[in-house]
Amino acid sequence: MSRTKGGTVTHARHKKVTDAAKGYYGRRKNTFKVARQAVDKANQYATRDRKNRKRQFRALWIQRINAAVRAHDEALTYSRFINGLSLAGIEVDRKVLADLAVHEPEAFSAIVDQAKAALPA
């Protein structure tokens, strides 16, 4: 019985890596060993940055809410606004608040007024 060398499987595996490395610079795009290292590192970055993206968007929403709150009332800060929301029983997440602040300022102003009224004087 002849030996099975698995050339088809190896070729398919190598092709998968080199296809993933398309667009890379230099030997990273066509040398299998270097391409595999580059693709592995790219996957590490992708995994890390999927986590970081959530943090960055939350920070962006907070900045937008803070700017809109201060534009509505200079004495009111972001933290006091969020406290007022919880005291008023308004359960709207930061993503929706930031979207309202950008696209529907009148509705956001109404929410700010309700949160401000709920704060202790």
From Swiss-Prot:
Protein's name according to its UniProt entry: Large ribosomal subunit protein bL20
UniProt keywords, alphabetically: Ribonucleoprotein, Ribosomal protein, RNA-binding, rRNA-binding
HAMAP family in the cross-refs: Ribosomal_bL20
Similarity remark: Belongs to the bacterial ribosomal protein bL20 family.
SUPFAM superfamilies named in the record: Ribosomal protein L20
GO biological process, one term: ribosomal large subunit assembly
PROSITE patterns: RIBOSOMAL_L20
UniProt KW Ribosomal protein keyword: yes
Pfam families recorded: Ribosomal_L20
Entry-linked Gene3D superfamilies: 6.10.160.10, Ribosomal protein L20
GO terms for MF: rRNA binding; structural constituent of ribosome
Domain of life, source organism: Bacteria
Lineage: Bacteria, Pseudomonadati, Pseudomonadota, Alphaproteobacteria, Rhodobacterales
Protein's job: Binds directly to 23S ribosomal RNA and is necessary for the in vitro assembly process of the 50S ribosomal subunit. It is not involved in the protein synthesizing functions of that subunit.
GO CC term, one of those recorded: ribonucleoprotein complex
